[in-house]
Amino acid sequence: MTGFFTILSFSLAALSVTNAAQILSVPKGAEVVPNGYIVVMKDDTSQQDFSSHRVWISSIHHNMTRRGLDGAGVKQTYDFDHLRGYSGIFDEDTIKDISNDPKVAFVEPDAIISQHVVVQQRKAPWGLSRLSNRRGGRNYVFDSSAGSGVWAYVVDSGVDVRHSEFQGRAVWGSNLVDNKNSDGTGHGTHVAGTIAGKTYGIAKNAKVVAVKVLNSEGKGPTSGIIAGINWSIRHARKHGMLQKSVLNMSLGGTYSAGLNHATAQAIKAGMFVSVSAGNDNINSNGNSPASERSVCTIAASTENDGKASFSNWGPAVDLYAPGHNILSARPGGGSQTMSGTSMAAPHAAGVAAYLIAKEGIPGNRACLRLKQLSQPTIRNPGPDTTSRLLYNGSGR
């Protein structure tokens, strides 16, 4: 697997030439894949033009290898309905040539994305009861449909699909980061348990599809996240499930135009997408995919309906959801408690799956429905931030 490193000062603006595609920069200190780039084509690029461009890229692969750039060339190809592009390892001369192609919209460094979990401790769950009661309570109130016929794509660190919480409803989908079809951090299994676990889950009858994009350190390249989204869309389309699917990404990193564009493609295709706002107590506008306006960006609330101290905020946030001391599944059996906006986002994904099954709404309309049902109960949500808390519409 390609190694990661942290750059102290990085700007590619100097590579740009007149009439060339923009080569975006990343903030100081951002962790990136060495010589890794994401290339996005212009919207009007035809399939034939894209194929011709890829043939040209293949022709210069040999030259890069001769210049001593190990593992050079295209690693992932993206072919969304309204976005075409690819990622790979390229030297500066090659990136300059790529940016000069009039079919290229922009190029950006392949930054590292991380999961949004902050602490683990043992405490009782409370999130399920809170999202089904306007004023709080001890019981989780829900319709027995419970997400039946809905698929939940967990784009994360993997899922222990054999965990008893999933009752055989979890399957392995794709691995875009390593060769280990397991959950090395427990993060993805916890997230999946909140969405669809029999005990800790909201949509207790939904199917879970594991899409691994984060390694055992909870990190992965942006290019792999985009590939995971691309795979999920294709898989849901193949099975006729686009409008009956939710996609959760409890992860994030520095702003990425490519990742935001790719995330938007899932909504355009018909899916519901929930993402975590981030855990730095800052405006989430600078993070991706949280800053993508078409997704459902979720901040974390506490047991007393306050903003969790770590939670990001800002106008990109669509809703608050329980994200502090959340009990859910652990790989190998059993359970564990975690906190973070990573725990808040799957609450939204679970309620979206629940409503898709119960009300028959298409996935890409579910975020609007969540906001319609939500309650304005969060105290001190942050500047220019909604105070609305997730609610499943149970009537309680």
From Swiss-Prot:
Where does the record say this protein resides?
A: Secreted
Q: What is the lineage of its organism?
A: Eukaryota, Fungi, Dikarya, Ascomycota, Pezizomycotina
According to the record, the signal peptide region is 1-20
Q: Which gene encodes it?
A: SUB5
Entry annotated with the keyword Protease = yes
Which organism is the protein's source?
Answer: Arthroderma benhamiae (strain ATCC MYA-4681 / CBS 112371) (Trichophyton mentagrophytes)
**GO: which molecular function terms?**
serine-type endopeptidase activity
The protein's matches in InterPro entries, at most eight in alphabetical order, are given as:
PCSK9_ProteinaseK-like (IPR034193), Peptidase_S8/S53_dom (IPR000209), Peptidase_S8/S53_dom_sf (IPR036852), Peptidase_S8_Asp-AS (IPR023827), Peptidase_S8_His-AS (IPR022398), Peptidase_S8_Ser-AS (IPR023828), Peptidase_S8_subtilisin-like (IPR050131), Peptidase_S8_subtilisin-rel (IPR015500)
Recorded protein name is: Subtilisin-like protease 5
Q: Where is the Inhibitor I9 domain?
A: 37-113
